[in-house]
Amino acid sequence: MAVLRQLALLLWKNYTLQKRKVLVTVLELFLPLLFSGILIWLRLKIQSENVPNATIYPGQSIQELPLFFTFPPPGDTWELAYIPSHSDAAKTVTETVRRALVINMRVRGFPSEKDFEDYIRYDNCSSSVLAAVVFEHPFNHSKEPLPLAVKYHLRFSYTRRNYMWTQTGSFFLKETEGWHTTSLFPLFPNPGPREPTSPDGGEPGYIREGFLAVQHAVDRAIMEYHADAATRQLFQRLTVTIKRFPYPPFIADPFLVAIQYQLPLLLLLSFTYTALTIARAVVQEKERRLKEYMRMMGLSSWLHWSAWFLLFFLFLLIAASFMTLLFCVKVKPNVAVLSRSDPSLVLAFLLCFAISTISFSFMVSTFFSKANMAAAFGGFLYFFTYIPYFFVAPRYNWMTLSQKLCSCLLSNVAMAMGAQLIGKFEAKGMGIQWRDLLSPVNVDDDFCFGQVLGMLLLDSVLYGLVTWYMEAVFPGQFGVPQPWYFFIMPSYWCGKPRAVAGKEEEDSDPEKALRNEYFEAEPEDLVAGIKIKHLSKVFRVGNKDRAAVRDLNLNLYEGQITVLLGHNGAGKTTTLSMLTGLFPPTSGRAYISGYEISQDMVQIRKSLGLCPQHDILFDNLTVAEHLYFYAQLKGLSRQKCPEEVKQMLHIIGLEDKWNSRSRFLSGGMRRKLSIGIALIAGSKVLILDEPTSGMDAISRRAIWDLLQRQKSDRTIVLTTHFMDEADLLGDRIAIMAKGELQCCGSSLFLKQKYGAGYHMTLVKEPHCNPEDISQLVHHHVPNATLESSAGAELSFILPRESTHRFEGLFAKLEKKQKELGIASFGASITTMEEVFLRVGKLVDSSMDIQAIQLPALQYQHERRASDWAVDSNLCGAMDPSDGIGALIEEERTAVKLNTGLALHCQQFWAMFLKKAAYSWREWKMVAAQVLVPLTCVTLALLAINYSSELFDDPMLRLTLGEYGRTVVPFSVPGTSQLGQQLSEHLKDALQAEGQEPREVLGDLEEFLIFRASVEGGGFNERCLVAASFRDVGERTVVNALFNNQAYHSPATALAVVDNLLFKLLCGPHASIVVSNFPQPRSALQAAKDQFNEGRKGFDIALNLLFAMAFLASTFSILAVSERAVQAKHVQFVSGVHVASFWLSALLWDLISFLIPSLLLLVVFKAFDVRAFTRDGHMADTLLLLLLYGWAIIPLMYLMNFFFLGAATAYTRLTIFNILSGIATFLMVTIMRIPAVKLEELSKTLDHVFLVLPNHCLGMAVSSFYENYETRRYCTSSEVAAHYCKKYNIQYQENFYAWSAPGVGRFVASMAASGCAYLILLFLIETNLLQRLRGILCALRRRRTLTELYTRMPVLPEDQDVADERTRILAPSPDSLLHTPLIIKELSKVYEQRVPLLAVDRLSLAVQKGECFGLLGFNGAGKTTTFKMLTGEESLTSGDAFVGGHRISSDVGKVRQRIGYCPQFDALLDHMTGREMLVMYARLRGIPERHIGACVENTLRGLLLEPHANKLVRTYSGGNKRKLSTGIALIGEPAVIFLDEPSTGMDPVARRLLWDTVARARESGKAIIITSHSMEECEALCTRLAIMVQGQFKCLGSPQHLKSKFGSGYSLRAKVQSEGQQEALEEFKAFVDLTFPGSVLEDEHQGMVHYHLPGRDLSWAKVFGILEKAKEKYGVDDYSVSQISLEQVFLSFAHLQPPTAEEGR
């Protein structure tokens, strides 16, 4: 039951996701309909011709050779060969034949057939040999007579000599050479009579090639040999004629020709997009870790696959139903695409194919971990498995049943063979019916439709098994692999024996032995929710083992939040991954709720809530749907779900967002939702990996409150990079370093162990004497130490144990402040950050934290000194420049940046190398670019050559027995005595052979017409020959009738009659068995298989187009990726010119395209494709390919603007290329078949499609080939030239002629469209189109702004903000040039249904050497402001100036002066850190000789040197932020924008970043920074503003804002554990009484956190009161610090509406 519930839930999830992806869903349903629509459209356009009367054919004489053979062959006489030459009987018979055939001819004998074949093959004499008569008797000596039962075969020329030119559109009806002796019926049957205009039956030419004349002459000669006189006498009164069966009224329908060839390909194309989508959707869940996350939540793997299967099956069922409807619905009276087939069987076939397609895509998905690659290779493999059909189709008749079945192991080949069978049954006039399921289409074939369906289902099972195995053994980056032999392990099938829960409780606690001073005693009254014992994890990197976690022992308790800290790479995430079952541990154990992780993961997952570091959300599910889905997945009943979801929405504060899709949520909201998912359904154990990363202060607070409220009955473990978060939330804090646990305890415990105590910072006046102050401090606190004395700042460390002495010290300092020359002083407690840094330093002494006290920390001390100032008025501005700054300034001025042409060349080179690096690193894709076209074309050529290399035709017995049991009608009109005699013999002979003679009393031809009308297609297989015997005057005419639907019926009919005459003359034992065994091809003929290769050009073009569809799409991948991650924007901000950016890409891509193009020429040469390689045409072929590259690459660049992700772009562009190439090419080509009668429409469409490079390539390649072969044929001989003229076969001497079949128009259009697409690309990139639109919208915008301003509530403006505005709006031209950044009344309105004012009239000036902080809640407008200032977004009104240049009109010059670090890392994964910095240095114009030093300095400053040569994709989040900042700083831009630069960094990395930024500031840069970390703003910013609703609400230095908007202190205290509760209540009452208005912020485990208000409280007073309370209330420890900037920030929270989205 639970399984069904989970399945239903997954189906609901998949269906909902699919429903929201409207375009994908529409395409999945639309493409099959489109291709079905093409067939319907053709069906409507192709007129079928009704032939209302029966077709009667005249009789044909076989007494003499056709007229053609009366002319001698070139320079010779005809030869009649016989074998064996040593037999007199054979020679006698042959001479008799020569005399009978009355043409000038000589007889030549050969000892054996081998001699004859050598003569034909190598002496090039086949043209003069009329035929060879080979007697199949040993003839032991020359006089041995011919037996009565004669067997012989005739060997005529393989190439027909007297064939009429038939132009039925050689693309589809490939007129093969030869006698078709491999088959009895055509491979593709025709509706109506075969060759309706040929009374002699046409192909293979039994009458017109003289075969029947020779056969009859040989038969008569054999009769004469055995009964000379009787034979002459018989033939004096008897004439044998041959006549074609009449054909009943029929509808001539050329459409059925097209469908037999094209239905397989159209079905393949119909499902191609779905195949790509399936692979992409499945892999995307794997790539985003959603699949593994669902598994952690308790989902079975087979259920996951089943749900996907059912969803896609449902969609394909709908598509297949519509296709069946379109195929079988009558579009005209009695006319449909498939007029006669059973719709239910067609649907069954399509569904079997759909199932195999889904299974195939599942199988492909298991080989990839990136959705892009899965889609790319999936599409290629999907088509690749169709290519073998090109081999199978031409040699279908040669293949055995087992070979056919084996080829059906590829589902696309099985589908093609099934579609071919449907076409054949349609053409037979019967259609496919359920009764035909196990019947072949004709006697030639042993393969039936039921076998196709069976093989499609078998394929699905086999693909499923591969999927199951691959997923188990190679689960991808985030799964746990099984051993390769897992399927033979009993434990896999039966499960492991359950470990007894609770058993581990008894184990001795190994941590006790290890307890040392850095591990606080564990709480004894709490239950351990998680127990970790000796846990280790070793990863194999290359050929080395790397320990990520070493021997970890830790207990995590219920009702507590345990915080796990560690710098990037310390082993935190690995530990959590082991606990959640993502990785198996290498050794050790862990128990969660009593269950062991490696054995009982299924049980554990039921109570496990997980919030990973990355948001594991489905883009298109709403907030409520996520909660509903995961609650049900964890096992909550459906009835309880709505209430639980409602409650959770309330808990996480997303009630108003319940119906918003997750992709529209801000980062903070996404994290809240992730936490909600972890909490829902009563999870007892919560594992939260950096739950608040990327949130603003207010959202973070909300999460903290949420976790504090939820922890009571849960075990919560969380990791974070925010030390204040660890301090505030952590009941116990564990710090890891290098994979080992270093310490564990409460925040106060760790501060006692590692912390120095209080930092007291004093700001000195000029007359201050540090010695006096030092004496005073040491007098009151003897063990105080001087921390630093730098510039105007003096800093002491006061030990915690001396807090009782602080009151006296502070009182003395306040009293003697002026006398000692102290401007201000303050104190701050050891922070958690210092503890963390100290632990890191102890572990790794090489990373000396003291060495990192660069300007950032010094400046922070300066800030602190003024922050805790007793008298804020005394705080003056400080000169930021010092020695380091001066040094950097000097270095900068020494380097002169490139400009003009030198800069453009340098930028072009940088962009070119970027593309080169991409190709080098993504070598698999480059390999695919080369191999896909080569493989497709090579396989096509192999298939074509294989089909035309053609085996020599085998021997075929011309007897009725070959056709099984048949009916032979005969009639004897009148009272002919000889006729009666003959008919009796005929009956006996046929019955002896197992045939069914049937006497017809009326007119034989009328009978045949009637039976054919009644029986339809079956008649042609059951009735092949007939005979009539009638007297005409004195003679009896024996008329042998043949059914021309079978190839060999003329000779078979004649053989029946001649046998009859032989039996009449020589008795019942006489018989003649004749066979047709065509001569082998001569070397000349093999070389001359020409003209009728029209389809070869078509096949090459089709395969080339398919390959190019995949190849061309790859050119968009980097463009889309760069745009998606904003790397392109950062490159433009760094000054790259549009032309350098795109033309360098175009040049590289053309070079990349040249390689497969040249290799294609090699392939053409290897296969000797004459049209493309001979007569100087190699250059033409290369030109065609390169012009295609020139046209398609800019088109792919243009299309990149439509997509947000590389995977989506790749799949959709591949489909676009297939549609714009193959579909249009097929449409035009099919219409060009003369029989279809749509030539004019095909010309019109051909002209319309000229704008599509794919279409041009297909048509050009096909036309070029066709023109070459036609021209070669028509100029090969006078006879050929005569034929070409007679049948109006056109060709062009000039291959580049404009009209068909010249390729001039395709060449010109590809050349022109390449230019057009490039121009359009530049228009878009240079914003010219946007500017035009902007001018048009300007009037409307002014109106919108005015309306918005009047609608907005007028909020009071802060005085500092008003003063800044006044100063900026005052006219002062000098300030424009000397101020790095000036913002004047900047506004941004987003045009939507309700216009949104995102930025509202900002005015600001940022000076040199200033770091300006832009603070605000998510949605306040910070990121929008950045986007406008960097030129990514247009300005609605106002303006901004960088170095005097307007952003609105001179964005190019502005960008050369700014550096930009966006909020999300705009990095290129395929480059190393060093390569990226070098690239940006070149973009900035740093001369090449200085780049190395400049990059080294940046790497050193950011401590990125160890990672400089690693690929960016391997960087941790922190290192990526460092690199992004380095990119912004390189090249010394005047203005630097940093959007949340330190997100995701650990404290050490963050400090280093601050140092770098501080150095840049001190060198005179203007820096604008946004951050969620108030600590960062205090450390770096000289001024800051807080934004609310797009406006500045306050502006000034951090201390100014704290003094203006904040007051009071923050108090934390911990009460002793004995009698804790009682003492705690008393202490709380004391605080409330002593500090009126105090607010209790937090309370847990005897710990309290208060906010103490009041500006009049002095440090001395606070410490005095608390020291007295310490003894009285049993306070173990306490700490006091001044209110933080964060609290000032939070005081503005109520002004920001909660619904505003991030990024505005």
Curated annotation (Swiss-Prot):
Result, substituting residue 1221 to A: Decreases ATP hydrolysis activity of 15% compared to the wild-type
CDD domains referenced in this protein's UniProt entry, alphabetically: ABC_subfamily_A
Primary localisation category: membrane
Domain of life: Eukaryota
Effect of residue 579 to P: In SMDP3; uncertain significance
Effect of residue 292 to V: In SMDP3; uncertain significance; does not affect lamellar bodies membrane location; does not affect proteolytic cleavage; affects lamellar bodies formation; does not affect cholesterol and phosphatidylcholine transport; decreases vesicles formation; does not affect free cholesterol induced cell death
Record's signal peptide: none
Modified how: N-glycosylated. Localization at intracellular vesicles is accompanied by processing of oligosaccharide from high mannose type to complex type. N-linked glycosylation at Asn-124 and Asn-140 is required for stability and efficient anterograde trafficking and prevents from proteasomal degradation.
The enzyme's E.C. designation: 7.6.2.1, 7.6.2.2
Substitution effect: residue 1302 to E: In SMDP3; uncertain significance
Effect noted on mutating residue 101 to P: In SMDP3; loss of intracellular vesicle membrane location; loss of proteolytic cleavage; does not affect N-glycosylation; loss of ATP hydrolysis activity; decreases ATP binding in vitro
Induction entry: Up-regulated in Leishmania Viannia (L.V.) panamensis-infected macrophages exposed to miltefosine. Down-regulated by L.V.panamensis infection.
Family annotation (InterPro entries): AAA+_ATPase, ABC2_TM, ABC_transporter-like_ATP-bd, ABC_transporter-like_CS, ABCA, P-loop_NTPase, R2_ABCA1-4-like
UniProt-recorded Gene Ontology molecular function terms: ABC-type xenobiotic transporter activity; ATP binding; ATP hydrolysis activity; ATPase-coupled transmembrane transporter activity; lipid transporter activity; phosphatidylcholine flippase activity; phosphatidylcholine transfer activity
Result for mutant: residue 124 to Q: Loss of N-glycosylation. Reduces protein expression by 50%. Affects anterograde trafficking. Reduces protein expression by 85%. Does not affect lamellar body membrane location
Expression sites (tissue/organ): Expressed in brain, pancreas, skeletal muscle and heart. Highly expressed in the lung in an AT2-cell-specific manner. Weakly expressed in placenta, kidney and liver. Also expressed in medullary thyroid carcinoma cells (MTC) and in C-cell carcinoma.
Result of changing residue 801 to D: In a breast cancer sample; somatic mutation
Catalyses which reaction(s): ATP + H2O + xenobioticSide 1 = ADP + phosphate + xenobioticSide 2; a 1,2-diacyl-sn-glycero-3-phosphocholine(in) + ATP + H2O = a 1,2-diacyl-sn-glycero-3-phosphocholine(out) + ADP + phosphate + H(+); ATP + H2O + phospholipidSide 1 = ADP + phosphate + phospholipidSide 2; 1,2-dihexadecanoyl-sn-glycero-3-phosphocholine(in) + ATP + H2O = 1,2-dihexadecanoyl-sn-glycero-3-phosphocholine(out) + ADP + phosphate + H(+)
Disease the record associates with this protein: Pulmonary surfactant metabolism dysfunction 3: A rare lung disorder due to impaired surfactant homeostasis. It is characterized by alveolar filling with floccular material that stains positive using the periodic acid-Schiff method and is derived from surfactant phospholipids and protein components. Excessive lipoproteins accumulation in the alveoli results in severe respiratory distress.
Name of the protein in question: Phospholipid-transporting ATPase ABCA3
Source species: Homo sapiens
Biological classification of the source: Eukaryota, Metazoa, Chordata, Craniata, Vertebrata
